[in-house]
């Protein structure tokens, strides 16, 4: 039973407000003596022309209280207390019967959502900054899919632009072919960094780079062959990383795919009277929207990524007819998205409102922001290796007899990195701290994974839940707090969708793990003399393990059975 829905439907019979809006304002009170659910009455004051306190008192007298232990008003709030035995039975039985499907719904059925994420630049390393958008987008895909949306995962590769002209120039001057095939990304990075250092001394190199890119745009054989080589080698390396972190895509269609669709965009904008010439470049003026012009074509005739994004948006609408198109791209690109989406709107595409930029912060180390150009980049592969190695050392110290130490270290080490990215709101910057990240205590990935392993250990030791379960035995504060947390899973998923924020799930699973460990530390289940109570607690442990596993899967983390 969805208690919030029941409350919303009953309030709807008394107050003129639709069920969906009511559902959204129902809260979980901060204190236990305030009930299990609370409805604030402030929003009804204007419509009913009464004080919120008076409304709460009046509604409380009229509402159908069946199925609740009690309903009472406290100031401007109506507090609902559930029947604990019924609540425990309904929640735990739902989890145990639905298992991997617990939390799933059909709210998104019939709706198509595109999610563009990761989108690394070809010939540049996949560094720790790229991982943020990659795991964020992958998690959004899993969360939307869980609720029935038909999702398409797009990796909009950065495989076009003037940087490829620079890279071709650098390749011709300084590339070591043996090094290129041995470690393509590192060699391409080396020559790219060298190009920029040399260009500081010889500005004509920049002109040479632009010339090579123009030749690439014109389809010149040698330049196209080199560009294809860079792309194939880069993609091979990127896929190694994606395999490590369990990330997949339905499409790798990058910027280059839209290069032959640029002229049509220019023509469309011109026909609609939106195109203006400025210093030789073709732009869409956005002064009245307090934005700089959106450049469509540069003075040298080369296209820019805003134009390619316009072409991609139109192509995707025609191809997929999406209901929502999500762009998971760093906050640094916020202005670009405002310009591009405003241009799309001005071109008469009302569906531009369905295109959403989901921004995220920076990843920082002691040295500050990461940058490819200067070469001070931390490779993601190195970060993952170090995390797995450090985790292995911790596990060796804590449990030297553990089987499958290598696999456990890999899952926990990589999981710890992903968890760190998705723990807080996506717009916040991330600062890596190994000690905190790999700790088995506190709000970390290893802590949550250890909670799951602890639950599985109890189940292995005590066996399966037997026959009919006496849920009325689960009356303690620790037991009921855990049951309430388990009940909140679907609400957390819907909240994550509403806010486009996977950290909602991460924070949720932290709270489940905390509630589970509080319960675990309060009671020695194996020594419980009351067999009915022991069986009920065993059912609760199994339900907790299922929910922790399901929640972790939504943020892309694999569980381990032992730690």
Swiss-Prot record:
GO terms for biological process: arginyl-tRNA aminoacylation. SUPFAM superfamilies: Anticodon-binding domain of a subclass of class I aminoacyl-tRNA synthetases (SSF47323), Arginyl-tRNA synthetase (ArgRS), N-terminal 'additional' domain (SSF55190), Nucleotidylyl transferase (SSF52374). The keyword Plastid does not apply. It catalyses: tRNA(Arg) + L-arginine + ATP = L-arginyl-tRNA(Arg) + AMP + diphosphate. It is an enzyme of class 6 (ligase). GO terms for cellular component: cytoplasm. NCBIfam families: argS (TIGR00456). Belongs to the class-I aminoacyl-tRNA synthetase family. HAMAP family: Arg_tRNA_synth (MF_00123). This is Arginine--tRNA ligase. It comes from Clostridium acetobutylicum (strain ATCC 824 / DSM 792 / JCM 1419 / IAM 19013 / LMG 5710 / NBRC 13948 / NRRL B-527 / VKM B-1787 / 2291 / W). The lineage of its organism: Bacteria, Bacillati, Bacillota, Clostridia, Eubacteriales.
